[in-house]
């Protein structure tokens, strides 16, 4: 089972992330559980730390085998997740990162930069 967790700065992208992730992994036999945030208007606003706690609880309990999370840069989500037990989270911004992280580090969580290249000319 794959858990999707979004923090508040990127909550508005949850639907797109869930749809794309599910579309790729479900044909391979994986199930994606969406733990939110579901939109920027959610009553409960999840912070990096809360996402890290949730990732740790899901992985430690066996409710999830893998967690996909992220934030604007992916760095804050990665640091928060790695602060809690039983989470080995890598920063993944491209397919090569994902492959090497899985092969070399045997992690159980990835943090993605959901706002990367979103400001175009400013980069």
Features from the language model and the residues they span:
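Generic N-terminal amphipathic, Lys/Arg-enriched alpha-helix
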Residues: 1-8, 32-37
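C-terminal binding/interaction regions
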Residues: 3-19, 98-123
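A short, Lys/Arg-enriched amphipathic alpha-helix followed by its capping loop at the start of a domain
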Residues: 17-30
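A short beta-strand-loop structural module common to alpha/beta enzyme folds
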Residues: 28-45
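Short, structured active-site "lid" loops
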Residues: 48-66
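Catalytic alpha/beta core domains of metabolic enzymes, predominantly
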Residues: 56, 70-71, 93-97
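A short, small-residue-rich loop immediately preceding and capping a beta-strand
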Residues: 64-70, 89
């Amino acid at each position: 089972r794959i858990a999707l967790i979004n923090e508040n700065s990127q909550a508005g992208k949850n639907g797109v992330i869930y749809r794309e992730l599910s579309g790729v992994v479900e044909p391979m036999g994986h199930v994606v559980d969406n733990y939110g945030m579901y939109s920027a208007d959610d009553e409960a606003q999840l912070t990096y730390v809360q996402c890290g706690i949730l990732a740790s609880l899901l992985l430690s309990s066996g409710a999830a085998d893998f967690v996909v999370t992220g934030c604007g840069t992916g760095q804050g989500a990665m640091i928060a997740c790695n602060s809690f037990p039983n989470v080995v989270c890598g920063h993944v911004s491209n397919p090569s990162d994902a492959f090497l992280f899985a092969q070399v580090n045997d992690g159980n969580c990835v943090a993605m930069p959901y706002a990367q290249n979103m400001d175009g000319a400013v980069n």
